[in-house]
Each structure stands twice: as structure tokens, then as C-alpha cells.
Amino acid sequence: MEASVLSPTSWEKRRAWLRQSRNWQTQVLEEEAAAALQDALDPEPSSLDDVFQEGNPINKIEDWLQGCGCRDTEEGLSEESGQSNYSGYSSHGTSFEDDLSLGAEATLLSTNGNLFSRNFLQTPRLCQLLDLGSSLASSSMTGGTNKTSSSISEILDQVQEDAEDILFSLGFGHENHKDTSRIPARFFSNPSQAKGINFQLFLKSQVQRMEMEDPCLMLASRFKQVQTLAVTADAFFCLYSYVSKTPVQKFTPSNMFWNFDPTDVPSIRILAPEPEPYSPRERLRRAISKMCLYTGSRDRLSSSYNNPKKNSLDQIVWEVMDRVKGEKIQQDPEHRQALGEESVPPIQNTNPSTSSLPCVSYPKEETQGDMCHAHALARPGPQYHINSTQVRRQLWVLQDINEKPRSAENESPWERKSKARKNLFQRVPVDKNIKSLNLPTIQQKQNQGQARHELTNL
């Protein structure tokens, strides 16, 4: 091998790095650095190691291998032993920037056969390297002996801890266990025979047990929900009974079977159904009120008898009833004789414009009109007939108008019309034996128009 020549700057950098990392003594470092500089500046190539020269005996190789194990007890295994040893240990700290390969320090041997690298590596230091405690490099040579290890078995015997044991304790080398390894083996050897719960069977058994305990299903003392359901069912069945008008048996138990607080049960007050009206007039009124949404309410209809002013619903009812009654009188002669009817002449040549106006608008002709109208009501006629009650009502209306002729003159036309309408629909007292019937409004207007027309002709 050729001698490697190192520049002085590289040795200075190496010396500075060794001083910082290993804390060597200053004097020893200066002497070693000076010797290294002299060897590096020598133009003659240094002689190679006897071990690597050809023709040397084999005993020198054995001596060199035995000398590799000599180390100081305090410094332990140096990191530079890998560079001087040909066995292949890694070098630490010997190469800083020059990137020396393994065995490069072997070229720095002196000519007298002494290994310069051995003296360089055997320099004592104050602090030791980091004690790994689990590696072969740190634990093989810290046994405190200066004996030379000539065999690999002796070096392995000096190891304090086994690397395989360390790796095994750290978890390496084990097989990956599955999740089933966490389950005890007894669960696999003797599996459970449970198949779950049959909810249908459970509910049936609960119902059967409740029926056996109380046939009437009065279990409110044990199940509070039964009480709530019973009260709710009673409320709905009472409502159904009220609508359908059919009696329904309640579910709520009596006090003798059920000790409950009355305040907990809500008081349900169901009004009795109203009796059906037997009067045809009331039934017709209800039928029209259901069909006509614009008619009055129930309170208004109930107070129609006390109020002299009739509403639109009463007017419709009276008109329909009078028409039906008039048709029956025309078709049944026996009914006509029983009532003692009086004929009314047919209406002919009636002016619609004059018939629509009431007779109140002509105060000067009221006296003559009343007389003519009274004679007209007494005339016999084959086409239209009315009874004595209708004649009395008509005469009462005309008499009421004649009693206040002066007040009618001072009133406005709108007040006269409203008063006339009010008098037309006012109730007339009749005998108890005779059923009261009102004259239709159309017939009254036509009769008044006919009387007025006769007065104008006179």
C-alpha cells in the first residue's frame, strides 16, 4: 500500500476535533501532532506494516492479532479500533473531513516496527464514551480485564447481556396475535347456548299474567299507564257516544276496585244531546241553516221569538210554510171548509213598479186605499184563497199605518220603508184554536199594489 500524505491543515482540524470530543491532554496532543507532522512531511514513503508485507512469517500476523486486544481498562473499547483492526469494525472519530477508509491509519506506522496508531489510540482520556449497555461494542470489553481475546467465543462470553433477549423483551420476534387471543379459551370450548329473547312470547306472557291477576284489567295500582290509557279511552268513547247518540260502556274502574286520587283524573263533562225538534218549522229552520252559511247563528235563531224583527232565515221559513199551506188549501176542499176560508180575487194587470213600493209612501190616499183593500179582500175569487187569520193580519197592518198618519208625513222615505218592513213581519196575536200563519211578502205587496191601482182609477 502506498503511504497516504495528509496536509498540515487536515491534522490541525483533526486535533481540534479530538480536543473537543475526547478532552485529551494538551501536552500529549502536541507531541502526537508533531510526530504525525514529521511523518507526513517526510518525502520518503514510510514502510508498510509487516503484517501487510509479502514474505513475512505467519507468527507476525498472530502477534498482531493478539496485540489488538490490549487496551487500557479505563478507556474501554476505542472507536478507532475498527480502523486499525482488519476484521471490519466501524471507525468513529478518525475521519472528519478527509473521509478516510478502513485501515487507513495502518500506513502511519513507524519504521522501527512499532504501531503509531496503537500509541495514538492508547492515549488516556478523562471521560468514557456513552455506555450503551445493550450493544456488543460497549459491553464486550468493559469486563475489567486486560487479557487478550484470541477467539470469537471468548469475546462473546464477555458480553454481559444477550442482544436476542433484549430484542425479545422489546417485542421483536413474536408472532402477531389476533383479537381472538384475548378471549379466554373456555368460551370457545364451551360456547353459550343462549339464543336471545322472543319479544312476542314475552309480551304474550305479560298479557296472560295480567289477565290472571285481574280479569277486569284494572291494574292501575301496579301500572300507572293503565290509568292514563283508561281515562283517555273514556274521553274518546264519551265523545263517540255524544256524536253517535249510543250508550258506550266506560273503561274507568269504580272507586271500590281502584284507590286513586280524584285530582289526578281529569274531569270530563259531556253535555247531554239536545232533543230533536218536533216542530216542522224548527226542522225546516235547521235544514236551511245547514245549507245557507250566511244565515244567523243558533243564539240568534233561538231569540227570534222574543225579537219582533225577523231575520232573513225566518222570512224564508214563513214564505215556504205559507206556500205549502196555500197549495194544500187549493188541493183539499175539505181542509178549506174546516178553516173557514175567505176568497181573495186574482191579481191581474198589476204594475211591477208600483207593486214594489209600499203603501206608506202615499199618505194622502191611505184612507181610501184601506177601504178599497178591505173590500178587495172580501171579494170571492176562484184562483187564490186565504183564511181569516191572514185577513186579520192584513187589516191589523193597515190599521197600524192609519193610526199614525201625521208621524209618517214628518219621517223620511228611508224611515217609512224600514217601518213598513218591520210592521209586515211583526207577529200578530191569534186565537189558540187556530194555527197562526203569516201572509207571504209577495202576496202582501201585490195586494197593496192592486189597492193602490184601484184608488188611482177612482
Swiss-Prot record:
It is found in: Cytoplasm; Endoplasmic reticulum membrane. It comes from the Eukaryota. Expressed in lymphoid tissues, with highest expression levels detected in thymus and lower levels in spleen and lymph nodes (at protein level). Detected in CD4(+) and CD8(+) T-cells, B-cells and mast cells. Not detected in monocytes/macrophages. The modification Phosphoserine is found at residue 312. SMART domains: KRAP_IP3R_bind (SM01257). Keywords: Cytoplasm, Endoplasmic reticulum, Membrane, Phosphoprotein, Signalosome. The keyword Amino-acid biosynthesis does not apply. InterPro entries: ITPR-bd, TESPA1-like. Residues 328-356, 439-458 are annotated as: Disordered. Disruption phenotype: Mutant mice display defective T-cell development, resulting in notably fewer mature CD4(+) and CD8(+) cells in the thymus. The architecture of the thymus is altered, as characterized by smaller areas of the medulla. Mice also have fewer peripheral T-cells in spleen and display diminished T-cell antigen receptor (TCR)-mediated responses. May be phosphorylated in response to store-operated Ca(+2) entry. One of its GO terms (cellular component) is endoplasmic reticulum membrane. Its main location: cytoplasm. GO terms for biological process: COP9 signalosome assembly; positive regulation of T cell differentiation in thymus; positive regulation of T cell receptor signaling pathway; protein localization; regulation of T cell receptor signaling pathway; T cell differentiation in thymus; TCR signalosome assembly. Residues 346-356, 439-450 have a biased composition (Polar residues). Signal peptide: none annotated. GO terms for molecular function: phospholipase binding; signaling receptor binding. Residues 328-339 have a biased composition (Basic and acidic residues). The keyword Ribonucleoprotein does not apply. May play a role in the regulation of inositol 1,4,5-trisphosphate receptor-mediated Ca(2+) release and mitochondrial Ca(2+) uptake via the mitochondria-associated endoplasmic reticulum membrane (MAM) compartment. Required for the development and maturation of T-cells, its function being essential for the late stages of thymocyte development. Plays a role in T-cell antigen receptor (TCR)-mediated activation of the ERK and NFAT signaling pathways, possibly by serving as a scaffolding protein that promotes the assembly of the LAT signalosome in thymocytes. Interacts with PLCG1 and GRB2; the association is increased with prolonged stimulation of the TCR and may facilitate the assembly of the LAT signalosome. Interacts with ITPR1 and ITPR3. Interacts with HSPA9. This is Protein TESPA1.
